[in-house]
């Protein structure tokens, strides 16, 4: 009964418009004061232990910073040019190229909203200019942008790993095949639609242009090799990889592509050495750091408050009670996965993915292990649910971002995204009930998962 009161408090605060993070934290603290023997001092200790013990969480601000430099520094337009050169000549080629571009940018950013902004701000206008409807373009980008949290490196995967003590490296590998499969399913759906509606296709630009586009995009795409190669080559940890990614992104944006900073100013005739020094204090660098800082603070504030709720649930032994009741009821793996999907699909409509994972993952993880479900399989399934949550109202973040980028009303974006959500639901069913899609690559490259019960 007391736990029901806690969730009523959380949901009630959200309904009256209290920000999600404050709803989680304030309701948990009020519950502690009224119904629990735990003290507020224990909350502070739990928060300290959570952040001190999860070195992995340090990767989040660095991945966000890398993503911001990549978005600002002209990487997106070079990736789009490369994607159009490769697949633009198919029927519906611009839409297909936008999905390919989202997949490639997802491998650099780890963030869905960043992918929508970076790719959508360029591609949507281009698609409309070439005969596509704005609704079609917005729907494709809104859904393809969700690949930002599925294709590694992914900020949401880092949060899941921190919440469940699962290897980040395994999670990243687990997202490769599902990410490619999701992109392929969207591409097939677009191609079929393009054939039916006779959508336009671009002329083949020739291999010379394709190679030139590949060369220009290679500096940005090399970041994927550095991150994943460094992690699986044992050169650095995921957190160190994130820091390297941030530095590399800064270097590429300022000194190679020269789309920001003093080198972007063609009228600046100062010596090269002076420009290099100015880069570190230039207004573009400051603006990028500010944007990354704002996003990091917002995300970490949500995670911190979600950790308070997690602490309360742990103090009240809720995970153990749920595990015992489900197992005693004879709940099998298939039924359990259906229940988890339903919880996440509903929760994902109202909460930011990272905060929801911090709360739900520790609750369902012990049950999954007891039922013999692979932690990587569970994690990827949860991430896919978060993808769908980002494109469903009322709080789907990608819907709001797409609305701003495409300059469309929220309701029109929801209608535009709806047909493609069906593809994502089909993909969720595949990921849920075909475990090897998520587990094959991690097992192949890192051996079988060792689980300590």
From Swiss-Prot:
Database matches in InterPro entries: DctM (IPR010656), TRAP_DctM (IPR004681)
One GO CC term on file? plasma membrane
Q: Where in the cell is it found?
A: Cell inner membrane
Instruction: Report the coiled-coil segments.
Output: none
Could you tell me one molecular function GO term of this UniProt entry?
Answer: transmembrane transporter activity
**Family to which this protein belongs:** Belongs to the TRAP transporter large permease family.
* Role noted for this protein: Part of the tripartite ATP-independent periplasmic (TRAP) transport system DctPQM involved in C4-dicarboxylates uptake.
Q: Which protein is depicted? A: C4-dicarboxylate TRAP transporter large permease protein DctM
Query: Which gene does this sequence derive from?
Result: dctM
């Amino acid at each position: 009964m007391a736990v029901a009161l806690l969730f009523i408090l959380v949901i009630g605060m959200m309904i009256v418009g209290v920000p999600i993070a404050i709803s989680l934290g304030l309701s948990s603290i009020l519950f502690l004061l009224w119904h629990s023997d735990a003290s507020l001092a224990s909350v502070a200790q739990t928060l300290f232990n959570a952040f001190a013990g999860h070195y992995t969480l340090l990767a989040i601000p660095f991945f966000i910073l890398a993503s911001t430099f990549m978005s600002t520094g002209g990487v997106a337009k070079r990736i789009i040019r490369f994607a159009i050169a490769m697949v633009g000549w198919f029927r519906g080629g611009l839409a297909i190229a936008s999905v390919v571009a989202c997949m490639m940018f997802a491998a650099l950013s780890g963030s869905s909203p960043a992918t929508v902004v970076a790719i959508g701000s360029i591609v949507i206008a281009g698609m409309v200019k070439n005969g596509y409807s704005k609704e079609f373009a917005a729907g494709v980008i809104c859904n393809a942008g969700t690949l930002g949290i599925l294709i590694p490196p992914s900020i949401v995967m880092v949060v899941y790993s921190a919440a469940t003590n699962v290897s980040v490296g395994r999670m990243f590998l687990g997202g490769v095949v599902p990410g490619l499969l999701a992109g392929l399913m969207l591409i097939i759906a677009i191609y079929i639609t393009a054939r039916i509606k006779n959508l336009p296709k671009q002329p083949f630009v020739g291999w010379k242009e394709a190679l030139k586009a590949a060369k220009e995009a290679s500096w940005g795409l090399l970041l994927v090799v550095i991150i994943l190669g460094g992690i699986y080559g044992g050169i650095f940890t995921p957190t160190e990889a994130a820091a390297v990614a941030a530095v590399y992104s800064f270097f590429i944006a300022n000194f190679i592509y020269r789309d920001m900073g003093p080198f972007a100013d063609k009228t600046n005739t100062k010596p090269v050495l002076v420009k290099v020094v100015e880069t570190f204090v230039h207004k573009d660098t400051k603006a990028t750091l500010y944007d990354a800082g704002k996003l990091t603070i917002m995300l970490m504030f949500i995670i911190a408050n979600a950790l308070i709720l997690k602490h309360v649930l742990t103090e009240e032994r809720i995970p153990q009670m749920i595990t015992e009741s489900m197992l005693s009821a004879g709940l099998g793996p298939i039924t359990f996965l259906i229940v988890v999907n339903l919880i996440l699909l509903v929760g994902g409509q109202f909460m930011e993915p990272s905060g929801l994972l911090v709360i739900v993952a520790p609750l369902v993880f012990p049950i999954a292990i007891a039922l013999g479900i692979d932690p990587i399989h569970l994690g990827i399934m949860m991430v896919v649910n978060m993808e769908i949550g980002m494109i469903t109202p009322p709080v789907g973040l990608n819907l709001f971002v797409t609305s701003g980028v495409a300059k469309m009303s929220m309701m029109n974006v929801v209608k535009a995204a709806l047909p493609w959500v069906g593809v994502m639901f089909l993909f969720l069913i595949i990921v849920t009930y075909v475990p090897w899609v998520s587990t094959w690559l991690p097992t192949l490259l890192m051996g079988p998962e060792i689980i300590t019960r």
